[in-house]
């Protein structure tokens, strides 16, 4: 039972569902599983993509993360996540509070924090056709009428790998642009905005890549997404397994710096 006198400053709603309740009971919270950047689903980088990435102020981010992803310690990330408090949006550590800021995002990742807010209406109708218009290939529709489409929110990384693994040497400028867009879509949805499946690129992060001249605040979106996902990780402790679906690298660097 929640006792305000024992935990001054804590919100009863958050505390009753926080993973810290398990620790207080003497139980060990389940290890959170990492979902994100898979080196086996990395596309081949091509310098011909750079003019497009530079126009969107994302070249530095791509150069930082185009290689093999760094090794991540799931246990350390779980421990850090368990110290997140929604009341303050910060990690409460023995040495004090620590939070991840927009400056951290910009300095560590290279994502731009200036520009338009990455918001808008998400329209599911016709998403396959919109994907085809931007990358030149339409994802196959789900044909099994006896089952619900298991991936209505995007395409499999294996599909992207199959169609866009390497840009042809004799590709036209239009084809190079499509491959560049798909490369960036693949990288963003694996590194910054992964989902719970661990194998799907959400189509809603492809729409902002339509116009290379639009300056989006990708860093702000990344930080908001990270905060939301960390909140989901520490709440609802009664689930046996949880997946960490956010920007693992930035949280690892901030954790190491403490």
Where are these regions (language model features)?
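N-terminal leader regions that mediate targeting or early regulatory function
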Residues: 1-230, 234-235, 239, 244
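Intrinsic disorder/low-complexity segments
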Residues: 238, 248-251
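Acidic, Ala/Val/Gly-enriched low-complexity intrinsically disordered segments
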Residues: 243, 253-254
